[in-house]
Curated annotation (Swiss-Prot):
The protein's name: GTPase Era
UniProt keyword Cell membrane, yes or no: yes
Family annotation (PANTHER family): GTPASE ERA (PTHR42698), GTPASE ERA, MITOCHONDRIAL (PTHR42698:SF1)
Positions of region (G1): 10-17
Main location: cytoplasm
GO biological process: ribosomal small subunit assembly
Keyword entries, A-Z: Cell inner membrane, Cell membrane, Cytoplasm, GTP-binding, Membrane, Nucleotide-binding, Ribosome biogenesis, RNA-binding, rRNA-binding
Organism this protein belongs to: Campylobacter jejuni (strain RM1221)
Length: 291
């Protein structure tokens, strides 16, 4: 029996959250084509044969001077020192520059490369990309082609990860899908619905705070605040006669209900907090692992 923690690292939009969801075969991690959709570290628990692997999905690595983005990168780097194995995720279409940047951080634990989205390319392109990574072979333990859409890739990746975990009793109940709090997951589903329903720029000025939860045997009651930075953005989030906010709520309610396996009553409010993305204390509260 082995058990350990695996930090998933990579640039924004490399497919980290989609990879976690495919390993779980459940929707846990927020998935969006927009950069830095993942703002908190989500712990997802995967049982592989008799072994327990706890994946930590981190914000994407990138370069930016904005306070929020700086804190996101700090969070990702910190997770590298708090794990047993690092899984570096890169798309088969990415250059190796992102991997070189990762190596410059001097990771101190073993790492494996997951070359993602291989179902979208041909064998010749895949072989060319593998040869590009070959010059770094002294650094990584293995490079594994992966597709989140094909289950046949799952076993090979998990088998490789387990090699580098220690013998240890389970850290979590094997029935659990995630060690992240339910509030974090509900928050991410609401934020994802904002990403899906609004233009590219607006979601970056928005955050979600869960104000109240009440869980009964047949009904989950949630109240949440959508934080945005201007009155004009507030108007866009609400929409004409509340249509946009209703659509966001409907989409989020469906996702939360699927996870909770019960009916959900979701009440959403929109609040303006100017310059929240530059308020370091507010951001640290948002990004706190225990939040």
């Amino acid at each position: 029996m082995k058990s350990g923690f695996v930090s998933i690292i990579g640039r924004t939009n490399a497919g980290k959250s989609t990879l976690i969801n495919s390993l779980l075969e459940e929707k846990i991690a927020l998935v969006s084509h927009k950069q830095n959709a993942t703002r908190r570290k989500i712990k997802a628990i995967v049982m592989h044969e008799k072994n327990q692997i706890i994946f930590i999905d981190t914000p994407g690595l990138h370069e930016s001077g904005a306070t929020l983005n700086q804190l996101l990168v700090q969070s990702a780097i910190k997770s590298m020192g708090d794990c047993d194995v690092i899984l570096f995720v890169a798309s088969v279409f990415d250059s190796t520059k992102d991997y070189e940047n990762f190596l410059s951080l001097n990771p101190q634990v073993p790492h494996i490369i997951a070359l993602n989205k291989v179902d979208l390319t041909d064998n010749a392109t895949l072989l060319k990309k593998l040869s590009e990574y070959a010059k770094f072979s002294q650094h990584f333990k293995a490079i594994i082609p992966y597709s989140s859409k094909k289950k046949s890739y799952k076993k090979g990746l998990l088998d490789e990860i387990v090699k580098y975990l220690d013998e240890h009793e389970y850290f979590y109940n094997p029935e659990f899908l995630s060690a992240s709090s339910e509030k974090e997951l509900y928050r991410d589903f609401i934020l994802e619905s904002i990403y899906e329903n609004l233009s590219d720029e607006l979601p970056y000025s928005s955050e979600v705070l869960i104000n109240r939860t009440k869980d009964t045997p047949n009904l989950l009651i949630l109240e949440a605040n959508i934080i945005t930075d201007t009155n004009s953005h507030k108007g866009m989030l609400i929409g004409k006669e509340g249509a946009t906010l209703k659509r966001i709520g409907k989409d989020a309610r469906f996702k939360i209900s699927k996870l909770a396996q019960k009916k959900v009553l979701l009440k959403l409010f929109v609040t303006v907090k100017k310059n929240w993305q530059k308020d370091e204390e507010f951001l640290k509260k948002l990004l706190n692992d225990e939040n």
